[in-house]
Every structure is written in C-alpha cells, then in structure tokens.
Amino acid sequence: MNKQIFVLYFNIFLIFLGIGLVIPVLPVYLKDLGLTGSDLGLLVAAFALSQMIISPFGGTLADKLGKKLIICIGLILFSVSEFMFAVGHNFSVLMLSRVIGGMSAGMVMPGVTGLIADISPSHQKAKNFGYMSAIINSGFILGPGIGGFMAEVSHRMPFYFAGALGILAFIMSIVLIHDPKKSTTSGFQKLEPQLLTKINWKVFITPVILTLVLSFGLSAFETLYSLYTADKVNYSPKDISIAITGGGIFGALFQIYFFDKFMKYFSELTFIAWSLLYSVVVLILLVFANDYWSIMLISFVVFIGFDMIRPAITNYFSNIAGERQGFAGGLNSTFTSMGNFIGPLIAGALFDVHIEAPIYMAIGVSLAGVVIVLIEKQHRAKLKEQNM
C-alpha cells in the first residue's frame, strides 16, 4: 500500500477513534456538570453545524493552500477541541470545544478525501474510498469500547487520550504526507450558475427529502442512546461501550457480508423500506425492554438497520445522478448534515420531557421514510409505464 495512503487512513482512523472514545462517558460527564438532554443535543448540533459551514471552505482552501496544510490545521483543531472538553467545567467551554471540533472535521475530511483522489490511480480510487469508509466505521466501533474502559479510571481520560491521538496524527502528517505536484480539484469545483439549468432537479427531490428525514431520525436516536440507556437501566460507561461496540460490529458485518447480496435481489428503494421497517420493530422492542440484558441484546441488533440504510441511500443517489456524481454527493452530504444538526436539538428537548420521546420520534420518522419510499416507487412505476 502507498505510504501516504496508509498515513491518511491512519489519520482518519485516529480521528474517528477519538470521536467514538467519548460516547460512553457523556452521560456521566453531563451529570457531573448538571447538564440535561437538551444540552447534549445542543453540543452535538453545534458540532454538526460547524462542520456543515466549514466543509465547503475547507475543500476550497485545500485546493488553494495545499491539502497537507489543511489536514494538519484540522488535526491541531481536533486536539484543541478534545483537550478543551477534558478540562471544561461549564457549558460555554464545552460548546466552544464542539464548535472547534466541527471545524476540524470540516477541514480534515475534504483534505483527506481530496488527497486520496490525487494520489490514487484511477482504477484504484473506488477501492481506496471503500477502504476509507471501512476505516471510519472501525474507528467508531473500537472507540466506544476503549473509551468505556478508560472511564473506569476517569470519565475525563478518554478526552485527553483523544487529544493525544490528534497530536500523533499531526506529527505523522507533517513527516510523511506530501502534496502531489499535480492535484485535482474535482469535488471542490466552483459553482457555475449556468450548470444549474442543465440539472434535472426533479429526480433529486425525493432522495433529498428521504436523506433529510432519515438523517434527522437516525441522529436523534444515536445522539441520545447513551443517555437513554444510562437513565433507563443505569448503564455505566463500560456497559454503554459494550453495547455500542457490539452493535457496531454486527452492523459492520452486515454491511460487509450481506449488503451487496441484498442489492442483487432488491432495488435501493425496496431495501431502504425493509430496513426502515426492521428498525421500527427493533425500536418498539427497545421501548418495552426494561432490564439490563434485554436492552443489551437489542443494542447489538438495533444499529443493523441504520447501518444498511446509509450505503443504500448513497447508492441510490449515485445511480440517479448520471454524470452529476459530484453534485449528487454534495446534496447527500448537505442534507445529511442538516438532519444531523436538527435531529439532536429536537431529540434533546424531547428527552427532557420524557425518556422514551426520542425513540417515539425515531419510530415516527422511520415510518414517514417508508411512506416517502412507497410514493417514490409508485411515481417511478408511472414514469416507466409512460416511457414504454
């Protein structure tokens, strides 16, 4: 494997390991500071909004100033964010930490993605981006597991460790990453108004609505999950880490071994509908579960539906985009970020009203997603009949 590709993968792994590390300790951390579910929603939303705003500028700056520089700046901001969260003793400091963390993600991700595109042979780009996705998932899976066990020492320790990982990634990037002499700006092109008139916007309406609705529901559930289990059955950070890591492993296994097989037998829309119905059933079981082991077992399988929906939507966008792959990817990313921003805000407020309210909302949103899919399938069937 190319040395620079390996370093880029390692950087991404460290970043997402660092993000995952802190998930199991958030309930203890919030209670220690006397914060509520609404406060947690604000912290998560601040990160998502900051990333959404900075990402386009991060991509443009990466092209103008060099991707290595933007990656390194992003890694430093990541470390600053984690150390601030570790020492923070009031809500304002934590909010500032999350804003800086979102800025770091908005710089590192476009930089890494662009650099992988630059240094990958054309026949290996798809494979390299596939590896990147798998590595991101691996960081999310291992992070909560490690963080939960670190919390046995101190609930602030995972944040210090994540900050240290950022510094390690920064040093490796300084030493081992080099900007190529020739670089591509694909994916960060300037928006030309005349191009917009050539785009068939109608084909993107339903995917955009579906992406917004689903990211809204999924982020709402995932944001409050650790707080939900801690309050409902008194899960410790270690218990939360086992639940999330187990769920992540099962989700990854289904993605790796079964997603392609399902796609041979189902269209993306049909598969999304079935995945949503599966998620609804499991979420209903979660509402009725009231003891340690039943919630642990449900936790191992609840994320499978969500983990299958995401690549299916991405695949659907890609298939309808034609030659507008960059445009479709931008729409997908933008509306996913919007959902990730709005979902935690509402879920946090609902959690303070009733512990099960965010779960009810996720169930309702998932059912709305099924309805949207059925409407889209009916619309496409009519178009197909008209074209015959």
From Swiss-Prot:
InterPro entries: MFS (IPR011701), MFS_dom (IPR020846), MFS_Efflux_Transporters (IPR050189), MFS_trans_sf (IPR036259), Multidrug-R (IPR004734), Tet-R_TetA/multi-R_MdtG-like (IPR001958). It is found in: Cell membrane. Pfam families: MFS_1 (PF07690). Gene3D superfamilies: MFS general substrate transporter like domains. PROSITE patterns: MFS. It is a multi-pass membrane protein. The chain crosses the membrane at residues 5-25, 42-62, 69-89, 99-119, 129-149, 157-177, 201-221, 239-259, 269-289, 293-313, 331-351, 355-375. Its main location: membrane. One of its GO terms (cellular component) is plasma membrane. Keywords: Cell membrane, Membrane, Transmembrane, Transmembrane helix, Transport. GO terms for molecular function: xenobiotic transmembrane transporter activity. PANTHER family: CHLORAMPHENICOL EFFLUX PUMP RV0191, PURINE EFFLUX PUMP PBUE. NCBIfam families: 2_A_01_02 (TIGR00880). Belongs to the major facilitator superfamily. TCR/Tet family. Involved in quinolone resistance. May constitute a membrane-associated active efflux pump of hydrophilic quinolones. This is Quinolone resistance protein NorA. The lineage of its organism: Bacteria, Bacillati, Bacillota, Bacilli, Bacillales.
